[in-house]
Amino acid sequence: MKEIIAIGGGGVGRNPGEGLIEQYILDQTGKNKPNIWFIPTATGDSEAFKVNYYTTFSKLDCNPVHLDFFKRTPDLEKLISEQDAIFVGGGNTKSMLAVWKDWGLDSLLLKAYETGVVMSGVSAGANCWFERAVVDSWEDELKVIDCMGFVKGNFCPHYDEEPQRRPSVKSFLEEDIFDVCYASEGNAALHIKDENDYLSVDFGKQKQSYLVSLVQGKVSEVAFESLSLRT
């Protein structure tokens, strides 16, 4: 099975140690003590983000490791072949993808995805799996960029957390930049299985993921079936 868990916001970077969505990710591997690989490229390998990652995952029954691109880079193919799950941190989506492409990590991730490694991440780490995404890589405005395209469609994280997100998605729909857009609120994730089975995972308080489109000129937000991790 091919799986992507795209988190709209929250989790390890914001509430280190809680571990709700992180345990959910580990559970999808089907392993008793899975190996998980953290990729914090989007923040330039932020030390604080790595601390939060280990604070969370060290409390869970797994083997957590991370990748540094801005030190001496290890054998990527060997490391990725040992993983059951990948977790990509948030930050600058555009810069992250450029680094990955230069190192060939995008191709290695695709191979791992196709062989059943669970792909996950938050914000930039959610954007990257789709064909295109709404990103804040520029200081002054939200833009749409091409991503890796493991799954078809467009994605917007932080849908309820940042005031410019909803109106920007509306504008992209009106301008025919998007036909539809997947969007996840903070503390919600969109779990996609085999590219056609969608589930919204709520690890906050009634947080949701949507399929957003224009219907007769008005924005339509259709909520996906949801699973709450707090009940």
Give residue spans per PLM region:
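Hydrophobic anchor at the start of a short beta-strand
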Residues: P64, M119, Q208-L211
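General beta-strand structural signal in soluble alpha/beta enzymes
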Residues: A6, H66-D68, F87-V88, S120-V122, ...
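Glycine/Thr-rich phosphate-binding loops of Rossmann-like dinucleotide-binding domains
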Residues: R14-N15, M96-L97, F130
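Catalytic nucleophile loop
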Residues: F87-G90, Y113-R132
